[in-house]
Amino acid sequence: METTTHAQMGLLDNLITSVVTNDFLQQLDKTLDWNPIEKTLQAMYPATTGRPPCPPLVLFKMSLLQHCYGLSDPQCEELVADRLSWRRFVGLGFQDAVPDETTLVRFRARLRGHGLHEKLLTLINRQLEQKGFILKTCTLADATLLQAARRAPAKDDKAKGNTKDGGDKDASHTVKHNQPHYGYKAHVAVDKNHTLIRAVTLTGAHVHDSQEFENIIKGDEEVVIADKAYCSGKHDQWCVKHKVANGILRKANRGQKLSESMVRVNRLLSSIRSRIEGVFGWWKRSAHYRRVRYIGWIANRLELEFKSICWNLKRLTTLSATT
């Protein structure tokens, strides 16, 4: 009887596979080689502890869905259970139990514990580079503000170091366009040709864009383009040292105006640099990433890593379909 049941379930899985489709997930599953990712994830589980109760690649794929669509842990669990195309993508059969939210929480903790909160994007990008989508001809740099998951602590609480009922010790204040912000800032470098994210860092909102320039620009590109916030003698020297063409928009010296030719150059560079805004627009509109979901830098750094991977995988499926 048990054998018959398993056979029936196998037939049902095959039937589902043949009729349930999600173009994005189908294309992604075919385009990306999951083996090196699975190997990296498996290394988090020592052989002495035995086989993990849930395959880590299943949890990784669930995390991708979660961050791609801006879902909470319970929402992700519910939708994977409900949507057959999502089950198929993550690698669960019709009869398989869906990992619960606690399992997702433990998985993220394990990723952070093994330092993968700053390494997963590089792992994905190796494949994008091998496929010829990251060309390194030109890198665009910019930053965007992210609201904290909690409100800013009251002044009295801050003075006492009490953030239990509000605030995040790693978030900070800044003002942009005369509007106060409390939270974080994502610093991003994008390969111009296909607008793929090459590097990201996360800081408190108060950190100036220019301070993360050398942490996100790799020095292997031919040109770097960034807005006036990055204009400084230090960065000019960095470009010379690394033999990278300097496309940082120029600022006028105090009491002087930019020449007409420099204004035209700035306008041209600005039109190219604006491509990076597409990343921020997708994050905030589609991935619901106007604010961070967690408390503390390391948890939110992992979230930024996943959001960046999701953007690149979205772009990968589009690029693969047109080449």
Predicted regions and their residues:
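Charged, often Cys/His-bearing segments associated with DNA-binding zinc-finger transcription factors
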Residues: 1-34, 319-323
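Short N-terminal amphipathic alpha-helices
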Residues: 39-40, 52, 71-80, 323
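Basic, amphipathic alpha-helical segments enriched in Lys/Arg and hydrophobic/aromatic residues
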Residues: 237, 242-243, 262-323
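Polybasic low-complexity intrinsically disordered regions
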Residues: 74, 78-81, 90-95, 99-242, ...
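RNase H-like polynucleotidyl transferase catalytic core
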Residues: 244-260
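Secondary-structure capping and boundary motifs in well-ordered enzyme cores
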Residues: 33, 50-57, 96-99, 268, ...
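Basic, short loop/linker segments at the boundary and entry of helix-turn-helix/winged-helix-like folds
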Residues: 25-64, 68-69, 259
